[in-house]
């Protein structure tokens, strides 16, 4: 027998252990079964899962469990993205090891990462995540790095990889280059500095406006709009930069916004992307004034060695002393920052560096065309990828100046020739491994290793190829070929809105260039998790909630329901009250099955399932099968929120509040045939509800299955059963009308009992229901209404009741008449009681009443008295309630 209370902390770990021990989710290659491969996102190994992980991976788990129940052979691996700057920072801090000791440093990075993986895997298991852990992969594994490097060699052979000096996004704090997808603009308060630049011929000044006066040493031109009447006459002249006494030209370009600041700007190498465009467009010189560490270099003259912020302040002060800084305006503007890592968020500089690139800009049209062949959920997320592809200014920077990462498998000579690693040597680390040749095969020069490592998106952008064993299949492995052919393209890529322009974009590009195919059939996008206050979760806001705070209190299933309520593609705030409601829903579900267990556990459903059912049974099963159809259709579209709401409402209200309450009298009654029919319907209803809920709340459904159904069915897990089958023959519109009417009648009677302080199971002696259009339906459910509401005598009467409203009591409002009539009040009260009906009529018609008491005239307005009326039917007082065309009389 199920215990009285639902305790997730007892049942959830039990079933998690059971699933692992019994290998319930073990993947086996079965070519005869349809494949469903999921390209799961490998989270960065930070050591802990946040609620964003819980949301996205619960969605994935719901899909995997559903597809297994639909008969698919579900390939559901889970990987971990290991490389990255945060790990290096952790190792430096915790172990005190410098990157100048690369071999020892790498060992500690790997050691720390394994600890993080163990913690995160345990957290995944604790939320009921049903991956096949035998297929777990790690981007730091040698075989994984070999696959990544093999893909790089293929790209190199195609002429897609090159090395050149180019302005790159540079993070001075992290000391590395970044891809465009790793940076973003943040709205911040700052200053706009208005500076007069002297004309070189001494004829005057041109005013410019800039947010970065510290970049003056890198100024190579001043730009104005060609149609700006204020400055047309100055185009072609030169200005002499104050402090540096260097002359630069004044040029005209249509990209200048004449409404910003003064309408004139200076072009520095490099303040922003526009500076790059102008430098290349006009073949201007390049002057760099900022070091990699965010300090000013020797080109900054007197400001060399200062941090950027210090130099900005100092040069502004000096220009003001010279009379050239004439205005400083506080503004809100966009600042480019390292937004991909919230632990950094440092301002980004654009520095020219020798970096490694993959050609991608020339393929953006191809990428968009491939993306069109993928089903996007929601559809408008495709536009984000398209917009990103069309906005790219330069190719993909794939090199990073770090230690812990997949090594770039190349050597270079002093003349710039690239020497790739041999495929048979992969994985290689040029920092430590012997090169494939002694000298450059092109020019004979000495060669040196490439010490940069790859951007982590290079690792993770081949995950659909990794999980389908492309890297083994291309070597000729026959088993891997079968695996690849069965599972590629993968069925699904689930991911967040924040990485459409990185993970989705680069995966489509890389997979297409390596295979000529799309990586997946479907892509489903979840939004970000916000804090309880609706703002982005942040320690600075104090609104961060971790899974470890939620699960001990409410369990994983209640938290999973919160994730399932998130709309696709939209941000979803964490709300404690929603999780609390979910927990109460699960307790309600538990109570339903606990009640039903004694009636259906030993019931032979197969023997009686074809019996003709009663109207309310047909109603609830018709509603059930509509839900089955709806849930199946919406799951195919990944709209979990719609299904979850529909299921929870159906179970809590139609099933628990109404149907079960309306069949209790049959289950405990003496009519054996009626009892049998109720059991058939109850079994079918609860068995299918359990299956519908299984992907969403896997723990409680497993517990219910083992308690009530396993003995008869035999399968060792609810998650190995088939998804409910929609039956058209169960749809009964007439029964649905009857069921809805029954719900409304019972609801009205419950309100009556509640208003009189009666328990819901209290007996009602006499109730009559008068109806016209609904009379026949009411006759059908007469016994159910009487049994449900414990009515001793229930009449269903065709027609309308003859009702008469009478005044039964009139009471004075003492605080109004007391001061006016004093000692006469008792006699006034007596007069009111003896003439209640007449006084009530006169008050209604005239708004007041006049009479004499002991010779004194009494005048009472309607505000002076309280009139109580009652309804009578055939001389007997009744209370009434109206439901549609039916009038309920309570005697």
UniProtKB/Swiss-Prot annotation:
EC number: 6.1.1.9
Domain of life: Archaea
GO molecular-function term, one example from the UniProt record: ATP binding
One of the protein's GO biological processes: valyl-tRNA aminoacylation
Residue interval(s) of motif 'HIGH' region: 43-53
Disulfide feature: none
Any one annotated GO CC term: cytosol
Top EC class of this enzyme: ligase
Coiled coil: none
Pfam family, one: DUF5915
Biological function: Catalyzes the attachment of valine to tRNA(Val). As ValRS can inadvertently accommodate and process structurally similar amino acids such as threonine, to avoid such errors, it has a 'posttransfer' editing activity that hydrolyzes mischarged Thr-tRNA(Val) in a tRNA-dependent manner.
Listed name of the protein: Valine--tRNA ligase
Organism ancestry: Archaea, Methanobacteriati, Methanobacteriota, Thermococci, Thermococcales
Gene name for this UniProt entry: valS
């Amino acid at each position: 027998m199920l215990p009285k209370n639902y305790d997730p902390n007892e049942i959830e770990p039990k079933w998690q252990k059971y699933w692992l021990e019994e290998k319930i989710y073990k993947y086996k290659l079965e070519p005869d079964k349809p494949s469903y491969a999921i390209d799961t996102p490998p989270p960065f190994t930070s050591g802990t899962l946040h609620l964003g992980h819980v949301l996205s991976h619960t969605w994935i788990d719901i899909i995997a469990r559903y597809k297994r129940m639909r008969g698919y052979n579900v390939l559901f691996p889970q990987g971990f993205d290991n490389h990255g700057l945060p790990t290096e920072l952790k190792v430096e801090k915790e172990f005190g090891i410098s990157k100048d000791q690369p071999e020892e440093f790498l060992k500690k990075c790997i050691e720390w990462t394994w600890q993080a993986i163990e913690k995160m895997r345990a957290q995944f298991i604790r939320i009921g995540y049903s991956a096949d852990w035998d297929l777990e992969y790690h981007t730091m594994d040698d075989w994984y790095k070999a696959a990544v490097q093999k893909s790089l060699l293929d790209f190199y052979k195609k002429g897609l990889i090159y090395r050149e000096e180019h302005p790159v996004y540079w993070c001075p704090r992290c000391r590395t280059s970044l891809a465009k997808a790793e940076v973003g603009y943040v709205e911040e308060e700052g200053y706009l500095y208005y500076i007069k630049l002297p004309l070189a011929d001494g004829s005057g000044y041109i005013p410019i406006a800039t947010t970065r006066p510290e970049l003056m040493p890198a100024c190579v031109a001043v730009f104005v709009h060609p149609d700006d009447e204020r400055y047309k006459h100055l185009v072609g002249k030169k200005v002499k930069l104050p402090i540096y006494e260097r002359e630069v030209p004044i040029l005209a370009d249509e990209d200048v916004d004449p409404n910003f600041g003064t309408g004139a700007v200076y072009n520095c190498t490099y303040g922003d992307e526009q500076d790059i465009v102008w430098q290349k467009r006009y073949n201007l010189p390049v002057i760099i004034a900022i070091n990699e560490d965010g300090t000013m270099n020797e080109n900054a003259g007197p400001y060399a060695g200062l941090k950027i912020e210090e130099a900005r302040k100092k040069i502004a002060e000096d220009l003001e002393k010279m009379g050239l800084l004439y205005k400083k305006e506080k503004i809100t503007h966009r600042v480019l920052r390292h937004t991909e890592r919230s632990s950094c968020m440092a301002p980004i500089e654009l520095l020219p560096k020798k970096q490694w690139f993959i050609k991608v800009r020339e393929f953006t049209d191809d990428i968009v065309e491939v993306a069109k062949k993928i089903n996007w959920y929601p559809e408008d997320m495709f536009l984000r990828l398209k917009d990103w592809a069309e906005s790219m200014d330069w190719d993909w920077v794939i090199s990073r100046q770090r230690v812990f990462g997949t090594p770039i498998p190349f050597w270079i000579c002093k003349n710039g020739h690239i020497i790739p690693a041999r495929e048979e040597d992969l994985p290689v680390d040029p920092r430590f491994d012997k090169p494939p040749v002694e000298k450059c095969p092109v020019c004979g020069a000495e060669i040196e290793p490439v010490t940069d490592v790859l951007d982590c998106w290079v690792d993770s952008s081949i995950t659909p190829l990794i999980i389908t064993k492309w890297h083994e299949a291309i070597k000729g492995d026959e088993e891997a070929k079968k695996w690849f052919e069965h599972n590629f393209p993968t069925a699904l890529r689930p991911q967040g809105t924040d990485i459409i322009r990185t993970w989705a974009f680069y995966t489509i590009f890389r997979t297409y260039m390596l295979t000529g195919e799309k990586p997946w059939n479907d892509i489903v996008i979840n939004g970000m998790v916000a804090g309880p206050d609706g703002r982005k979760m942040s320690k600075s806001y104090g609104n961060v909630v971790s899974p470890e705070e939620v699960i001990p209190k409410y369990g994983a299933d209640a938290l999973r329901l919160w994730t399932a309520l998130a709309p696709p593609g939209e941000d979803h705030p964490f709300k404690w009250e929603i999780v609390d409601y979910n927990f109460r829903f699960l307790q309600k579900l538990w109570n339903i099955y606990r009640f039903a267990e004694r009636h259906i556990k030993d019931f032979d459903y197969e023997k009686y399932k074809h019996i003709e059912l009663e109207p309310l049974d047909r109603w609830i099963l018709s509603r059930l099968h509509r839900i089955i159809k709806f849930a199946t259709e919406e799951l195919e579209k990944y709209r979990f929120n719609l299904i979850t709401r529909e299921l929870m409402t159906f179970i809590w209200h139609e099933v628990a509040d109404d149907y079960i309450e309306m069949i209790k009298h049959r289950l405990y009654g003496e009519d054996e045939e009626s009892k049998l029919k109720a059991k058939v319907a109850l079994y079918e209803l609860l068995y299918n509800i359990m299956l519908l809920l299984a992907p969403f709340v896997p723990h409680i459904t497993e517990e219910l299955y083992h308690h009530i159904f396993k003995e008869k069915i035999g399968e060792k897990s609810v998650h190995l059963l088939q998804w409910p089958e929609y039956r058209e023959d169960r749809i009964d519109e007439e029964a649905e009308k009857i069921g809805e009417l029954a719900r409304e009648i019972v609801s009205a009677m419950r309100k009556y009992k509640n208003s009189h302080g009666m328990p819901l199971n209290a007996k009602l002696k006499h109730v009559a229901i008068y109806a016209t259009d609904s009379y026949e339906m009411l006759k059908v459910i007469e016994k159910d209404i009487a049994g449900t509401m414990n009515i001793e005598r229930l009449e269903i009467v065709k027609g309308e009741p003859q009702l008469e409203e009478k005044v039964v009591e009139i009471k004075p409002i003492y605080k109004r008449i007391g001061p006016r009539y004093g000692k006469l009040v008792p006699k006034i009260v007596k007069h009111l009681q003896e003439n209640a009906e007449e006084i009530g009529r006169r008050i209604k018609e005239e708004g007041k009443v006049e009479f004499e008491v002991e010779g004194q005239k009494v005048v009472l307005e309607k505000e002076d008295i309280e009139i109580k009326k009652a309804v009578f039917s055939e001389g007997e007082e009744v209370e009434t309630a109206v439901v549609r065309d039916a009038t309920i009389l309570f005697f």
